Structure formats: structure tokens, C-alpha cells
């Protein structure tokens, strides 16, 4: 039977249904239990917010049937038998957190609910079969408490989603023996993941769609998805992709992250992937993003925006020299700017528009 454990409180299905939620002061617990209560009462439509990292947050209203299809797709892929122990440490007003709760309710899991924080395993001591993390959480676990991965059972799985996985994090994950760790691809509109790639063990370069998920590219090379979670209605994403003969695909970047600099189209994510390796080589541990800033000569000038204080002059010189090794001369930033703190959404995604 599905159970939610939060700090020292235990709630089973019957208790959740009977709860007077006005008596619960903890906002995260109350919101999570309210969602569970509505689901257990048989609601046919669920309200879900998008994170707003790529624009104004919006609300969608998926059906119960579509949400159950998402649970079934994941259950088939991960071969869940029911009764698993899972850690729920994501914001439950967004789709990733809601889907964790729904999998638990539908499959009779024991769910350890935890207010989202940077290292969910820091003080955690229970055995686990499944967890979903954002990349920042996974990185903190591996850097600060790698021994906590021993809490995961032999057949356990971890999924990572919500933001891109850096080259540095991917390298760390590749050396983890157990549990199996996957990166997911999906969005609010597809009711969490519709494709998956393995990051350790027999790792994969590309995402593989889950069963019954159909993909194609439109004329702009944007990925179009049809799946049980969309009730087989096609969703046109903003993600520029490549699809391969084996049915797998790779995301190159977002259509709205292409700039036109002096007549040359540049996909910002491709530049960032190369610059990230340069940061690693010179031992620079800072967050950064590439943006196109308006310019009379270039139209949009490729600009590297680094989080934090201005770098010492010798470090910035070293960085500029390293740029000469980039695979494409158009990938060399024309300008470096600094921002004390990047603006983030509630789910920890950086708002690129705020960098301009």
C-alpha cells in the first residue's frame, strides 16, 4: 500500500484521504498531500505549472488517463513490481515531482518525501529502489556524499532531469558502478520523460524513446513528439535535434538559442559544450552561459556571461588564449561579461533572458 513518510510523520492512503489539510503548516507537505488527496478522490483533470525557464510560466491540464499512461510507460521500462522504496525530493507543484507522487500512489510505493535541497542524501539513511534528481543534486551527492549511493539496492535506478547534464557531471557518473543512472528527456507537456539515456555501465550517447513514443523532425529540425502521454496528439518542441537510424536522437540545443552573428548562425549550446571543457582544463569552476547581445556591427554579438566576480586579469587572458582551440572560429566569444548571481526559476533552471 502506498505510504508517504515525511520527517517522522507517516501517511497511508486512507489517512491522506481523510486529512484536514488546513491543520498542516508545512507548505511543501501540504501541497504534496493536497495533490495526492485529489488524485485518490478520483480527479479526472490535474493542474500543472511549467517552470518558466524559457518564457512566461503557463498552466496545462492533463487528463487522468494521460498521467496513468506516463506511470505505465516508466513502469514498463524500469520493470517495477510495486512496493518499491522511492525518494521524492523535487518540487511537487511541477510535473517531475507530481509524477513521482503518482508513480508511488499507483504502484504502492513507500515514498520518502523531502523538501527540495541541494543534497537530498546528506542526512538520509533509508534503503532505496528509485530516486529522481536534478543535475545539481546529483553533483552534490557525488562530490560530497558518494558513499550514500550504497543506500540504493542492487536493481535500483536513478533518473536525472530538469536541466542539462554537464560534461563534468557525466564523467563522474560514468565511474559509478551501482545504481543504474539515466538522463531523461521530456517536458511538462509530455508529462515528464518520454526518452531515456543510460549514463553509467553500458552508457549511451543518445536518447532512446520509450515504447509507443513516436518522434520526427519538422522543417526547422525541431523534435515533434507523439506518445500515450500526449494522447497521441503531436507536440512540436523547441528543441533542435538529430534522429538516427536506430531510432535514437540527440538534442543540439533550443531553436530560440540560435543567434545570427555577422550572418553566421550559431547554436549557443554547442559553443557552451566546448567552453565547458576549456573551463575544466584551466580549473575554472564557475557557471556560465553564452548569449547574443545586440550589436550594430554583428547584429548579435556572441557574449560569454560568467557568474560571480570578475576573473583576475591573468585568468581571463588564459581563457581568451584557450578560445583559439575551439573547433570553430565563430565560437570564440567577442565579449566576456559578469553577473553576480544568475536568476533562476523555482526548479533551479537559469533564465537566459535575464542575462541580456
Task: Explain the meaning of each model-derived region.
Residues 1-26, 68-87, 117-129:
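Conserved ATP-dependent adenylate/AMP-binding module captured primarily in the ANL superfamily
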Residues 31-49, 83:
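Conserved pre-ATP/AMP-binding loop-to-beta segment of ANL
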Residues 45-72, 79:
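Conserved AMP-binding A3 loop
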